[in-house]
């Protein structure tokens, strides 16, 4: 295990891949919710469904972070989550990290709502929030996100496992 923090570009690529994987997980979770509760209209139990999807997302991340420190996207991009000492992340710390990670979105969305932002401003304010949050790693001496610093976790690079050459067929 290396202690080098992954570059921002690698983290953002991992997040993009993670969002595609999470789309499938949340699609199934939403389908289960609407099927089991016989949801016939999109607004029926809307807030309960939103809470359900936030909980499913949290369960997804917390499970992977506490069982090896990597989601599939993190494995693909050779990134691992560890605590500040390099050890495995306990469940309470993974939950804290998940909740703090919402700071990527909530301040920008809250500000946009408070300002009564419409159309393009509704997208611009949260996008600026995301940009500021991402580039803030350059203010951290260990190049960690703010939510990692607050949760006592770190993202580190892992060395890719070398592929073994296919065993040569031996003549008999």
Q: Where are these predicted regions, by residue range?
A:
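Hydrophobic, lipid-facing residues on alpha-helical transmembrane segments of integral membrane proteins
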Residues: 12-28, 32, 47, 51, ...
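Membrane-helix interface segments in multi-pass membrane proteins
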Residues: 26-54, 108-130, 138
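A structural micro-motif at secondary-structure boundaries
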Residues: 82-94
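Juxtamembrane cytosolic face of transmembrane helices
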Residues: 2-15, 19, 60-74, 88, ...
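Hydrophobic alpha-helical transmembrane segments
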Residues: 1-5, 40-51, 67-79
């Amino acid at each position: 295990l290396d202690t080098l923090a992954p570059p921002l570009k690698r983290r953002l690529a991992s997040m993009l891949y993670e969002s595609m994987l999470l789309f499938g997980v949340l699609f199934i979770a939403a389908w289960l919710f609407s099927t089991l509760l016989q949801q016939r209209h999109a607004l029926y139990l809307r807030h309960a469904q939103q809470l359900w999807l936030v909980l499913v997302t949290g369960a997804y991340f917390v499970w992977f972070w506490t069982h090896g420190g990597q989601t599939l996207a993190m494995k693909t991009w050779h990134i691992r989550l560890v605590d500040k000492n390099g050890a495995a992340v306990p469940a309470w710390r993974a939950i804290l990290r998940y909740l703090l990670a919402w700071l990527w979105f909530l301040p920008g969305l809250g500000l946009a709502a408070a300002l009564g932002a419409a159309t393009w401003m509704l997208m611009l304010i949260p996008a600026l929030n995301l940009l500021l949050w991402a580039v803030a790693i350059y203010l951290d001496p260990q190049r960690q996100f703010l939510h990692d610093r607050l949760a006592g976790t770190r993202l580190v690079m892992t060395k890719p496992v070398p592929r073994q050459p296919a065993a040569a067929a031996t003549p008999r």
